[in-house]
Protein backbone atom coordinates (compact mmCIF):
# COMPACT_ATOMS: atom_id res chain seq x y z
CA UNK A 1 0.00 0.00 0.00
CA UNK A 2 1.51 3.33 -1.01
CA UNK A 3 0.17 5.37 1.89
CA UNK A 4 -1.07 3.12 4.68
CA UNK A 5 -3.83 4.53 6.86
CA UNK A 6 -3.13 4.45 10.57
CA UNK A 7 -5.66 4.46 13.41
CA UNK A 8 -6.45 8.03 14.43
CA UNK A 9 -4.87 9.52 11.32
CA UNK A 10 -6.51 12.54 9.71
CA UNK A 11 -7.38 11.83 6.10
CA UNK A 12 -6.61 14.94 4.10
CA UNK A 13 -6.87 15.86 0.45
CA UNK A 14 -3.07 15.97 0.29
CA UNK A 15 -2.88 12.36 1.57
CA UNK A 16 -5.25 11.12 -1.14
CA UNK A 17 -3.69 13.23 -3.90
CA UNK A 18 -0.26 11.81 -3.09
CA UNK A 19 -1.64 8.26 -3.11
CA UNK A 20 -3.37 8.70 -6.46
CA UNK A 21 -0.52 10.59 -8.12
CA UNK A 22 2.02 7.92 -7.17
CA UNK A 23 -0.09 4.87 -8.00
CA UNK A 24 -0.16 4.93 -11.83
CA UNK A 25 1.72 7.08 -14.31
CA UNK A 26 1.34 7.07 -18.07
CA UNK A 27 3.03 9.17 -20.76
CA UNK A 28 2.66 9.20 -24.54
CA UNK A 29 4.72 10.48 -27.45
CA UNK A 30 3.07 13.70 -28.65
CA UNK A 31 4.83 14.00 -32.04
CA UNK A 32 6.95 11.79 -34.29
CA UNK A 33 10.68 11.81 -33.51
CA UNK A 34 13.22 11.21 -36.29
CA UNK A 35 16.73 9.77 -36.52
CA UNK A 36 18.55 9.69 -39.86
CA UNK A 37 21.92 8.09 -40.62
CA UNK A 38 22.93 7.76 -36.96
CA UNK A 39 23.12 5.14 -34.23
CA UNK A 40 23.28 7.85 -31.54
CA UNK A 41 20.31 7.77 -29.19
CA UNK A 42 17.77 10.58 -29.03
CA UNK A 43 15.85 10.74 -25.75
CA UNK A 44 12.17 11.60 -25.90
CA UNK A 45 11.11 14.55 -23.78
CA UNK A 46 7.56 13.12 -23.69
CA UNK A 47 8.36 9.58 -22.54
CA UNK A 48 9.79 10.46 -19.13
CA UNK A 49 8.37 9.39 -15.75
CA UNK A 50 9.78 10.22 -12.30
CA UNK A 51 10.59 7.19 -10.13
CA UNK A 52 10.64 7.33 -6.33
CA UNK A 53 13.53 5.99 -4.26
CA UNK A 54 12.77 2.67 -2.59
CA UNK A 55 9.79 1.99 -4.86
CA UNK A 56 8.95 -0.90 -7.17
CA UNK A 57 6.85 -0.70 -10.33
CA UNK A 58 5.34 -2.84 -13.01
CA UNK A 59 6.29 -1.45 -16.41
CA UNK A 60 4.59 -1.68 -19.77
CA UNK A 61 4.99 0.18 -23.01
CA UNK A 62 4.06 0.17 -26.66
CA UNK A 63 6.42 1.80 -29.13
CA UNK A 64 5.28 2.35 -32.71
CA UNK A 65 8.07 2.83 -35.21
CA UNK A 66 8.74 3.18 -38.92
CA UNK A 67 12.11 2.24 -40.37
CA UNK A 68 13.80 0.36 -43.19
CA UNK A 69 15.01 -3.23 -43.11
CA UNK A 70 18.56 -1.88 -43.29
CA UNK A 71 18.36 0.59 -40.41
CA UNK A 72 16.14 -1.35 -37.99
CA UNK A 73 15.59 0.39 -34.64
CA UNK A 74 16.99 0.22 -31.14
CA UNK A 75 14.99 1.48 -28.19
CA UNK A 76 16.23 1.89 -24.64
CA UNK A 77 14.94 2.89 -21.27
CA UNK A 78 17.32 4.58 -18.88
CA UNK A 79 16.69 4.25 -15.15
CA UNK A 80 18.09 6.02 -12.08
CA UNK A 81 21.47 4.80 -10.83
CA UNK A 82 21.02 1.71 -8.70
CA UNK A 83 17.65 0.73 -10.17
CA UNK A 84 17.27 -2.86 -11.36
CA UNK A 85 14.75 -4.31 -13.77
CA UNK A 86 13.43 -7.46 -15.36
CA UNK A 87 11.91 -6.45 -18.71
CA UNK A 88 11.25 -8.38 -21.90
CA UNK A 89 9.77 -7.06 -25.16
CA UNK A 90 7.68 -8.67 -27.87
CA UNK A 91 8.72 -7.42 -31.29
CA UNK A 92 9.78 -8.33 -34.81
CA UNK A 93 13.28 -9.68 -35.08
CA UNK A 94 15.85 -8.11 -37.37
CA UNK A 95 16.07 -9.39 -40.92
CA UNK A 96 12.30 -9.41 -41.45
CA UNK A 97 10.79 -8.89 -44.88
CA UNK A 98 7.06 -8.28 -44.39
CA UNK A 99 4.55 -7.30 -41.76
CA UNK A 100 3.46 -10.94 -41.26
CA UNK A 101 6.58 -12.19 -39.48
CA UNK A 102 6.93 -14.38 -36.42
CA UNK A 103 6.80 -12.58 -33.11
CA UNK A 104 10.13 -12.38 -31.33
CA UNK A 105 10.17 -12.54 -27.55
CA UNK A 106 13.57 -11.39 -26.41
CA UNK A 107 15.13 -12.86 -23.30
CA UNK A 108 14.35 -11.19 -20.00
CA UNK A 109 17.10 -8.74 -19.17
CA UNK A 110 18.12 -8.55 -15.50
CA UNK A 111 19.63 -5.13 -15.93
CA UNK A 112 20.46 -2.06 -13.92
CA UNK A 113 20.30 1.49 -15.26
CA UNK A 114 19.77 0.83 -19.02
CA UNK A 115 17.65 -1.64 -21.02
CA UNK A 116 18.07 -1.80 -24.81
CA UNK A 117 16.06 -3.68 -27.43
CA UNK A 118 16.56 -4.05 -31.16
CA UNK A 119 13.63 -4.60 -33.50
CA UNK A 120 13.38 -5.04 -37.25
CA UNK A 121 12.06 -2.69 -39.85
CA UNK A 122 10.33 -3.72 -43.07
CA UNK A 123 10.24 -0.67 -45.33
CA UNK A 124 9.68 3.05 -44.97
CA UNK A 125 5.95 3.59 -44.50
CA UNK A 126 5.33 0.24 -42.77
CA UNK A 127 4.51 0.76 -39.10
CA UNK A 128 5.76 -1.83 -36.64
CA UNK A 129 5.70 -2.07 -32.85
CA UNK A 130 7.65 -3.28 -29.85
CA UNK A 131 5.83 -4.16 -26.60
CA UNK A 132 8.03 -4.40 -23.48
CA UNK A 133 6.65 -5.41 -20.08
CA UNK A 134 8.34 -6.07 -16.78
CA UNK A 135 9.38 -4.98 -13.32
CA UNK A 136 11.50 -2.07 -12.05
CA UNK A 137 12.91 -1.80 -8.54
CA UNK A 138 14.46 1.54 -7.54
CA UNK A 139 16.89 0.47 -4.83
CA UNK A 140 19.00 3.62 -4.96
CA UNK A 141 18.16 7.26 -5.54
CA UNK A 142 15.02 8.66 -7.11
CA UNK A 143 15.29 9.73 -10.73
CA UNK A 144 13.64 9.47 -14.13
CA UNK A 145 12.77 6.64 -16.46
CA UNK A 146 13.58 7.99 -19.93
CA UNK A 147 12.94 6.40 -23.34
CA UNK A 148 15.39 6.91 -26.20
CA UNK A 149 15.78 5.46 -29.69
CA UNK A 150 18.14 5.35 -32.67
CA UNK A 151 18.83 3.43 -35.83
CA UNK A 152 20.48 0.10 -35.11
CA UNK A 153 22.53 0.45 -38.32
CA UNK A 154 23.18 3.95 -39.64
CA UNK A 155 21.27 4.43 -42.89
CA UNK A 156 20.33 7.55 -44.88
CA UNK A 157 16.60 7.01 -44.28
CA UNK A 158 14.29 8.32 -41.59
CA UNK A 159 13.66 6.09 -38.59
CA UNK A 160 10.65 7.32 -36.64
CA UNK A 161 9.44 6.78 -33.10
CA UNK A 162 5.79 7.46 -33.78
CA UNK A 163 3.27 9.69 -32.10
CA UNK A 164 1.06 7.64 -29.79
CA UNK A 165 3.86 5.46 -28.43
CA UNK A 166 3.40 5.16 -24.67
CA UNK A 167 4.77 3.95 -21.35
CA UNK A 168 2.94 3.19 -18.10
CA UNK A 169 4.11 2.41 -14.59
CA UNK A 170 2.10 1.08 -11.69
CA UNK A 171 3.71 1.46 -8.29
CA UNK A 172 3.39 -1.74 -6.26
CA UNK A 173 5.31 -0.62 -3.13
Regions found by a protein language model. Name each.
Residues 1-4:
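Acidic, negatively charged sequence signal
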Residues 8, 17-173:
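Surface-exposed molecular-recognition determinants
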